[in-house]
Amino acid sequence: MGVRGLQGFVGSTCPHICTVVNFKELAEHHRSKYPGCTPTIVVDAMCCLRYWYTPESWICGGQWREYFSALRDFVKTFTAAGIKLIFFFDGMVEQDKRDEWVKRRLKNNREISRIFHYIKSHKEQPGRNMFFIPSGLAVFTRFALKTLGQETLCSLQEADYEVASYGLQHNCLGILGEDTDYLIYDTCPYFSISELCLESLDTVMLCREKLCESLGLCVADLPLLACLLGNDIIPEGMFESFRYKCLSSYTSVKENFDKKGNIILAVSDHISKVLYLYQGEKKLEEILPLGPNKALFYKGMASYLLPGQKSPWFFQKPKGVITLDKQVISTSSDAESREEVPMCSDAESRQEVPMCTGPESRREVPVYTDSEPRQEVPMCSDPEPRQEVPTCTGPESRREVPMCSDPEPRQEVPMCTGPEARQEVPMYTDSEPRQEVPMYTDSEPRQEVPMYTGSEPRQEVPMYTGPESRQEVPMYTGPESRQEVLIRTDPESRQEIMCTGHESKQEVPICTDPISKQEDSMCTHAEINQKLPVATDFEFKLEALMCTNPEIKQEDPTNVGPEVKQQVTMVSDTEILKVARTHHVQAESYLVYNIMSSGEIECSNTLEDELDQALPSQAFIYRPIRQRVYSLLLEDCQDVTSTCLAVKEWFVYPGNPLRHPDLVRPLQMTIPGGTPSLKILWLNQEPEIQVRRLDTLLACFNLSSSREELQAVESPFQALCCLLIYLFVQVDTLCLEDLHAFIAQALCLQGKSTSQLVNLQPDYINPRAVQLGSLLVRGLTTLVLVNSACGFPWKTSDFMPWNVFDGKLFHQKYLQSEKGYAVEVLLEQNRSRLTKFHNLKAVVCKACMKENRRITGRAHWGSHHAGRWGRQGSSYHRTGSGYSRSSQGQPWRDQGPGSRQYEHDQWRRY
């Protein structure tokens, strides 16, 4: 994670940038400096999972009671010190970082293979050096923290950007995590979670200002350094030859430096002594070997610019950024500019604006001086104060607006000047809504074309003016142009929405009504909380008016910014999308918003033995459930399309090279009374709707016929029974002994304290039990998905693992059951548990019999169970799917047009 080699460099070459600090003292200082303001730490939760998971056992599926207790202690310690914690989780994987995500998943696969090899050889858990976090840890940590009353947020993009942005905008005490990217962002202080001593609240602060002093750079140069070294966006090998050229020049005058540390020092030296000379005179691609990677490089640099920040290394057009607090922020990232650092002139005095010089950079940076308040606004400040955007103040609104210059023609781009200036501003003003619209100048015909920017100026869209109505209609970029174009804006969720052309698979734009009675500004300052125009039905009707024009000149690929990715919206209902987005941001759902917005989801590694052909991967087992959920969530989309939609699944399973996502189609389901709409499931508060929610949930598991039996089961075992029925119907190699172990551990868990679970030690580690434990936990995460998609018919606490599963306890029961121990022994001679055990077992077995699945012990297995999963002739999707394992093979291998075609072999593991 983070910048390649920077963590090691800091530890070996620049240890002085690490300072031991105490959170209690920092909090006290913060309170005295900002009275009435609670000291707040933004926590990058994904970086902290390894630190938080303190239980000794991790191989058996997770010690969830112990883990929950550790989280509670963590929260209590900071609360006692008067420190508020805000937890951020990754809500999605950005496309720019997909390759890095895949690389890590494949690396994890190799680690898992070594883990299972060790287990089979030693029959014990490997040492902590082979530690692998239990499956579902990130998902359930969100719910654990919410249960503990903590503010928990799920990101709409990569979490590190939102963490850094939140910390800067809310004047936080600092960021707690373990990612060197936080040394690159110009934000609040960065503290290490790995160095945290919870008892004393001591940790290490990594100071980016001291890092800059050591490297001879200023904070604004760090994104350039990070991209030249390699990060999650820029592959490490992209500039390898360039780095070694820098190293050759550097080592010729320096001696006795280690190679790795030398590279970072050498690249920094090249930036400060060579690149500085050309700054403002040449573009980066003229002084760096960017080649075909120019767009990616600029995108990597722009990804570090927080709302309101600019880079002195390239000039940017303002782009709208949506943060979790629904604030629309202006950032910019025009890489095609001349990189001239603009000078602002006082409109009255015509004086040139003074320059400010950073302490280490030895270069001048312009500032703009407002004629009235005489307040200097630096473009690039020294490392201590925060970096600001040069702004002009409009004569009426007194609102600060970032300035920009047109890079190609020598024509001034729309600027606003001081109140005394009598300078004409090249702005297009709609006389009715008083909406300022910047003009777009085509460099070839030299003809001015009005541009539509909307309230979130992410991307300029050429406007077509009708000859009669004089109404501006947004132009549609055809499928050949391969250009992503901004479409409608969700009025309340502040999210930009895209829809997909079903044949071209291109993103089709829809714009807000251009004659809306609302003001659309060209750009906004970071502190302006600008409201978006309210969307109307007319926006959708504009689709029919949009004309295809493949001739439209594409915007330069270097015009990128750290905004939320423009998404292919699978669902067009903005009200439902708003609800889904809210649940997503508040960490109340799992995958639902990803499915509805982008139609793309992922699932990380699971402890699965790739050599065990008898147990299928959890990705396959739970796929039919996900397909039915897709049918529910995307029903609105399917009504208006002639071709069936497909969701892109990046699920890790043995043998999957992850070169492409699996294209998975929705699977229709039969629900008593018909499939209810999402508005009914999510928004209708009538008591009778709860029955329909439960019917829908059971239909997702294809268990509508077992509704009465499941309703008779008491909490919290209802959800567990539903999951066990599904598992045993789907996987024929699960036997009666497995069922006994699953039920026994759930019952015994209810009477165990955390200390009892800590002291529990299985006789040895069985690789099959390891995989079964992970399989059940992945089933619980699937329950989170289904429950949230259906409007929460069940209490979330009923299927939280700390209430129904413990890894070591399950392992113990599995080993006992495998050896043929009596049920009374499994239940620890507790008679009350015995009655519940037989009731739960009866419910599962009866439901399975309805699906023609008889659960037997291992002694009754025939030869067809050896090394294969599934019974010949049984339907994988069971009732109502039309697929059969014996006749059709695995149905997900043929997903129709546009999907990858797979070999027609029902047992082939990719």
UniProtKB/Swiss-Prot annotation:
Keyword Transcription: yes
Principal subcellular localisation of the protein: nucleus
Keywords: Activator, Differentiation, Methylation, Nucleus, Transcription, Transcription regulation
Signal sequence segment: none
Modified residues (Omega-N-methylarginine): R885
One GO term (biological process): peroxisome proliferator activated receptor signaling pathway
Ranges of biased composition (kind: Basic and acidic residues): 335-351, 360-375, 396-411, 901-910
Bias type Polar residues, positions: 872-890
Keyword check for Transmembrane helix: no
SUPFAM superfamilies: PIN domain-like
UniProt-listed InterPro entries: Coact_PPARg, PIN-like_dom_sf
GO CC term, one of those recorded: nucleus
CDD domains: PIN_FAM120B-like
Region (Disordered): 333-416, 443-483, 863-910
Subcellular localization: Nucleus
Tissue-by-tissue expression: Widely expressed.
Function: Functions as a transactivator of PPARG and ESR1. Functions in adipogenesis through PPARG activation.
Protein family (similarity comment): Belongs to the constitutive coactivator of PPAR-gamma family.
Record note on quaternary structure: Interacts with ESR1 and RXRA. Interacts with PPARG; in a ligand-independent manner.
Protein's UniProt name: Constitutive coactivator of peroxisome proliferator-activated receptor gamma
Organism: Homo sapiens (Human)
Origin organism lineage: Eukaryota, Metazoa, Chordata, Craniata, Vertebrata
